Amino acid sequence: MSERIFIGVAWPYANSQLHLGHVAGAYLPADIFARYHRTRGDEVLMVSGSDMHGTPITIRAEQEGITAAEVAERYHQRFMASWPKLGISWDFYTSTATANHARTAQEMFLSLYEKGYIYKNTVCQPFCSHCNRFLPDRYVEGTCPHCKYEGARGDQCDNCGKPLNAAELLNFRCKNCGNPPEFRETEHFFLKLSAFEEELIRWVETKTHWRTNVLNFTLRYLKEGLKDRAITRDLDWGVPLPLPGYEGKRLYVWFEAVIGYLSASKEWAASKGQPNAWQKYWGVDTKSYYFIGKDNIPFHTIIWPAMLMGKGGLNLPYDVPSNEYLTTESQKFSKSRNNAIWVDDVLSRYGVDTLRYLLSANMPESSDTDFSWREFVRRNNDELVATYGNLAQRVLTMVCRNYDNKVPEYGELDERSLTLIEKTAAMLCETDKALYNCNFREAIRLAMALAQEANRYLDEKAPWKEIKVDKAAAARSLYVAMVALSGLRVAFYPFLPESSGRLSTYLGFGSELEKEGWILKMPVVGQELTPPEPLFKKLEDSVVEEETARMGL
């Protein structure tokens, strides 16, 4: 039975390029999940967009001496160019700079305000007398009071993931000039998170299918007690407050950006000429998944659900399969600290499926994982080239050369051959279960294990020897290996769409796997075949030294 799946994916700040940490953390797992569900025949809407507001953009604009709008648009266009290179299959990708988004965010604000979930309060905020202005969140840096990380910001600690405010930081300073700010009174609007504490605890305690790290982090945070949080800032860049007399204030980006999932859904529906079509993806009969990095967990498991509870009539998240951090040399990738491997740079030298494979096999699902160029080369050469790619190349080349470029007759199969076919069908069932439960590393491991089993079968049968004495026996062995390849093209498709599409074509099925379903299709005897090209290219060992040198390591 088909399902309806909504996939919301973290909105990247439009202040720098995409790096591998972003891809492994949110965008690749979301794309894998979307492709899998489409192949199953489910209704899928996967949305995201560029976060054009917030202090990361204004900080960069000030550094470059241009407007925040210019910075945001530059990187939004770069993101738009990067997604196809990565094979990210958005149903809709937009930005927070649209009139539709501003309207949707303001409607959410007014709804919560009118229901008493947003209120005004006078608070002390950091003010830099040297720069003569209030300092919103990321304009203040200091030491985290919880984990003592010295690079924490006035909105959050990237090291331990806890949301903060500037007053909590130790040894705080203005990011712009380095001087310690003073605190002055200013009026802001607050989201009454405390009103949702008990309801959120009851709701989260039902989420036993969540990843352990996400569930434990959320429950621990909730049971410490929720504090009301300011949702406005003294800025001139962002979504204006929809109330008179507050022209100098904007909606705080953490409140505004999560509303993007809703505004993007509405914009998608309008683009289809069906302005109400978004509603079915926000009803109770839809499963909503939010793919994010671990620094965004509380915003998606606590704050966004609280906003949805307050608004009413909108579906709460079913799952928030947050990943941990991808590191390099045990350091977190960071745009703001310029410690990263940039996506466009990597893809200018290596195939997209090679990158997607390593990031999938090494995905930081339950703990931080380290990106290594040595591992990148090893997995490409040993697993993609020597195992999976070699299986496809030698089977299809032998078939095309010896059976007139057609799928051969195979006759009666022996027990060993039937066992491999059964294992292929079982692998598809097992990967289906793993993917359904967002266990991506397990799914790709199962697929590669089947490729290894198919190679063992081929080595046992040795059709290159059989063909010299019994062409019919060789045909049986090669046909069974083609069945295994047919299963592998499906299992690998969510992870490696480019090579899976080519393999599918070489097997005579065509390249549109999503239309076929998550099933094992048997190659059709007599089907014309195209001689294959290698699915993957071997990398030289020198790549390790070259790439580490580029990183300055």
Swiss-Prot record:
GO molecular function, one term: metal ion binding
HAMAP family documented for this protein: Met_tRNA_synth_type1 (MF_00098)
Family: Belongs to the class-I aminoacyl-tRNA synthetase family. MetG type 1 subfamily.
An example Gene Ontology biological process: methionyl-tRNA aminoacylation
Residues at which Zn(2+) binds: 144, 147, 157, 160
Catalytic activities: tRNA(Met) + L-methionine + ATP = L-methionyl-tRNA(Met) + AMP + diphosphate
Motif ('HIGH' region): 12-22
One matching Pfam family: tRNA-synt_1g
This protein's UniProt keywords: Aminoacyl-tRNA synthetase, ATP-binding, Cytoplasm, Ligase, Metal-binding, Nucleotide-binding, Protein biosynthesis, Zinc
Organism listed in the record: Dehalococcoides mccartyi (strain ATCC BAA-2100 / JCM 16839 / KCTC 5957 / BAV1)
Name of this chain's protein: Methionine--tRNA ligase
Secreted listed as a keyword: no
Job of this protein: Is required not only for elongation of protein synthesis but also for the initiation of all mRNA translation through initiator tRNA(fMet) aminoacylation.
Residue ranges annotated as motif 'KMSKS' region: 332-336
Gene3D superfamilies xrefs: HUPs, Isoleucyl-tRNA Synthetase, Domain 1, Methionyl-tRNA synthetase, Zn-domain
Main localization (coarse): cytoplasm
Cofactor: how and how many bound: Binds 1 zinc ion per subunit.
Localization per Swiss-Prot or TrEMBL: Cytoplasm
EC number of the protein: 6.1.1.10
Subunit relationships: Monomer.
Name of the coding gene: metG
